[in-house]
Structure formats: C-alpha cells, structure tokens
Amino acid sequence: LVNKVNAFQASYPEWPLPASICVYSNFAATVKEARKADFNITVVSACFPTSQSFLEVKLKEVEMAVEQGADEVDIVLALNAFLAGDTEAAAEEIRQVRRVIDEVAGKQGREVHLKVILETGLLRTPENIANASFLAMEAGADFIKTSTGKVDVNATPVAAYVMCECIAKYQAVTGKKIGFKPAGGISTAADALCYYSIVASVLGKDWLNKHMFRFGVSRVANSILSAVEQKTVSYF
C-alpha cells in the first residue's frame, strides 16, 4: 500500500495524494521507513477497536507509536465508561492520551494530531452523539471521527450532521476548529458526496481540505477515481 501511494502521482499527476495511510501502531516505523511521498502516518491505537484494556497499556501503545513516527493517532472513546454515565472517566482518558502525545512529540520537535472515534453506531441517539462530540473536543481531540468500521452501524448522515453541528458550536464558543472524519460504510462516490455536502453546508469551505476533513475508508478512493475518470479504476 505504501508503494502504491508513493507511486500514485506518477499514474495520476493531476490528483492530490491521499492525506494519510492508516495502520496499526506497530506498523508506524515500517510505513515511515518506506514513505517517499508527502502523506501522514495515522495509527489506530490505545487498544483499537474496542478500547478495552488498562489505561497504562493504552498510553504505552500511544507513546510507542508516536516515538516510531506516527503523525496522527486515532483512539476510541471509552464507551464502557461513557455509556455507564461516567463521562469524567471517559474524558480523563482522552486527556491522558493527549498529554502523552504532546510530551513525546514535543521532544521530537513536531506536532501529532489526536482523533477520537465516537463509535456513533453504539451511541445510537443524537443526544449521545452530541454529548460525546463535545466531551472529546473539550478533552483535547483535534478531530472527531464517527466509527471504527468494526461494528454493525458505522457512519451515517444523521451522525455526521450532529457531529458537524457540534463542531460548529464549539468553534463559535472557543474559536478552535476541530476536524471531522466519517468512517465505515462509505463505499461509493455518491456516499462521499453526501458527507462532503454535509460538511460544506454545516461547517463551510474552511473545512473542505485534508487538514479538517477526511474519509476513513480506503475502498472509496477507487470509487471516486472511477467516477471522475469515467472508467473502472482499481489502483488501491
């Protein structure tokens, strides 16, 4: 996959590179060594996809991933705590991850972004999704992400709309711009256009770039390429 991204613009010079390659934490160093193009290394970390382990284990995994070259760290909200009503425990875990990321990246003289996956399919209600969105942003997330792609219900337009509304409200109050990443269940160019339209209408043009808006699904890349090129493309 890294080699394909490295060579992508040789085949499609008019297209931008994918913003990032997403791998498990233990592959960060492998991707860093093989990387020859300008893309970020994203890791799913802290006991992805369930987030079920000791906090110390999660923090150590994040620490090692950043040490080995991760540019972005995706973690899953501690749903066991959040859904049980212990929102402070869920928030504190995000704060601790944020602290570790900043400490390790700071020693390396760089910034590493934190994305918090809400797993909206398990949160179920717009109220829960909104509460989780604000919790993650206030605890230090640079991005909020819908889903792991590992449960029955992943990204939905309703969840995306709620999350984008929360991002807009948070920005209005704090001045901070938080990114948005729908993930899971997005497989066609039409799906991608739906989420693009939500972001454009709720958040505006300042979010329509790779720094503020991502898709967390690899298969949609071929669908978008195929739609624009008007032929079947199976590059990725």
Each language-model region and where it sits:
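Short, hydrophobic beta-strand segments that form beta-sheet elements in well-ordered domains
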Residues: 20-23
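Metal-centered catalytic cores of metalloenzymes
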Residues: 222
